[in-house]
C-alpha cells in the first residue's frame, strides 16, 4: 500500500513537470484530460499503459466510534470435535496462528477421546454368531481464550468458523463479565441491622 502511494506521488510530480496535468477539485465532478481521469474519491492515472489507484484522503478514520460500551469476556471456550486427527491438528495450528495475529492469549488442551462401538449382524438374514463390530472415534480439541472484548471475539469466531473444515463440529462457550446490580452491591445484613436499630429507637 505504501509503495503504491509513493509510486502515485512520483507519477503526479512527473506529470506536473510536463505541464499537461489539470486538477478539478469540485465535488462530484470528474475531469478527463490527456489520458488522465480525476474523481473526488479515487484518482485513476494512466500513463503508457500503467494504471495506479491512489486514495485521495488517507487521514480519514475508518473505525466508527459508538457510545455503547463493548462487552467483556473473561473466557471464551471453543470445543472442536472430529474423527480425523490430522484434520484437527491442522485446524488447531490455524486457530492458534489466527489468535496470535490478533494478539489474543490462547491455551490448547486435548480432552480424552470418546469411542462408541456398535455390534451388528453382518446381514439381516443371518445367524447370531456372524457379527461385525463398528467403531466410531471422536477426537476433541479445546481452545481457551482469555480476557477478550466483544468485537475481538466476534471477529475471531467469524474467521475460524468460516474456515472450519468438513466433518468438524464446533461448540462455543462464552463467560461474560457483568457489573453487580445496584440492589446487590450492599450486603443485606447491613441494611437489616440498620432497620432494627431504627425500630428500637
UniProtKB/Swiss-Prot annotation:
Subcellular location: Mitochondrion
SMART domains given in the database record: Ribosomal_S10
Top-level division of the source organism's lineage: Eukaryota
Main localization, broad class: mitochondrion
GO cellular-component term (any): mitochondrion
A GO BP entry: mitochondrial translation
Keywords tagged on the record: Mitochondrion, Ribonucleoprotein, Ribosomal protein
Subunit and partners: Component of the mitochondrial small ribosomal subunit (mt-SSU). Mature mammalian 55S mitochondrial ribosomes consist of a small (28S) and a large (39S) subunit. The 28S small subunit contains a 12S ribosomal RNA (12S mt-rRNA) and 30 different proteins. The 39S large subunit contains a 16S rRNA (16S mt-rRNA), a copy of mitochondrial valine transfer RNA (mt-tRNA(Val)), which plays an integral structural role, and 52 different proteins.
Family: Belongs to the universal ribosomal protein uS10 family.
PANTHER family attached to this UniProt entry: MITOCHONDRIAL 28S RIBOSOMAL PROTEIN S10, SMALL RIBOSOMAL SUBUNIT PROTEIN US10M
Stated name of the protein: Small ribosomal subunit protein uS10m
Organism annotation: Homo sapiens (Human)
